[in-house]
Curated annotation (Swiss-Prot):
PROSITE patterns in the cross-refs: CHIT_BIND_I_1, CHIT_BIND_I_2, CHITINASE_19_1, CHITINASE_19_2
The UniProt record lists the keyword Magnesium: no
Keyword set, alphabetical order: Carbohydrate metabolism, Chitin degradation, Chitin-binding, Disulfide bond, Glycosidase, Hydrolase, Hydroxylation, Plant defense, Polysaccharide degradation, Signal, Vacuole
Name this protein carries in UniProt: Endochitinase A
Keyword Signal in annotation: yes
Gene behind the chain: CHN48
Documented EC number(s): 3.2.1.14
GO cellular component: vacuole
Amino acid sequence: MRLCKFTALSSLLFSLLLLSASAEQCGSQAGGARCPSGLCCSKFGWCGNTNDYCGPGNCQSQCPGGPTPTPPTPPGGGDLGSIISSSMFDQMLKHRNDNACQGKGFYSYNAFINAARSFPGFGTSGDTTARKREIAAFFAQTSHETTGGWATAPDGPYAWGYCWLREQGSPGDYCTPSGQWPCAPGRKYFGRGPIQISHNYNYGPCGRAIGVDLLNNPDLVATDPVISFKSALWFWMTPQSPKPSCHDVIIGRWQPSAGDRAANRLPGFGVITNIINGGLECGRGTDSRVQDRIGFYRRYCSILGVSPGDNLDCGNQRSFGNGLLVDTM
């Protein structure tokens, strides 16, 4: 009997040690990170959907009923506008309002700043180097998704980010049967906005997280610039196991497991490309799409006055698996 008690006590202590060693998942305890799939963020910084997470007095953000409380700015943070000014935004996305660009007049600095207020950890976590790299990485990845540049384009190919708004060609409806995220009649879930979010199973949880019904109104991502930026920031800040969030990677919070190291997934910009589209672009040696992302990143780091860091490529990384965007590329 004493042995049983000792074993039970040991198990309990081991569980508590594991819990204490785990990093919080959301809210002010996690740099303003948001819970995935519409889960509530508890006052202690954990994601869930029971009363302990969502109930009055227990929920700090993404709570049911009413507006989402804004977590306080995390330590080491600060005003996003002090890192990227309106003039820098215009310099980075120099040709976004070119007459040839579908997104002319849509993507604005004010819309970006307003959207970022819903994700207070973005661009405000860590030291100045981490903050600048996050902004450079976010705009590099989204610029690749929306680029209108070409090799001999005026000012170079990396001055043409945010040219496109909707997926080009003749996209399908991207509707996958789902009981949780059912497709609305007549709606299409092709790529839209900075990150080109696609599929009903992404529009659904994204809409829930930002407080908009995107299943019934997917084109809000292409008609409301604040919602458009929020869709990209939601993707950026949201982890999808086994993948970390892009945010956690670029600020240095993510630490690779033994499995990640065996797959050559080491902290740096390359892992973010793996998160976004690793199934098609990573582990293939030199890939022009990966190099395009890196080209944008290097340019934006130069404008922001920060070094790009290490591990920019994913050519020798094994993929995490299918990304949110893999079927749209």
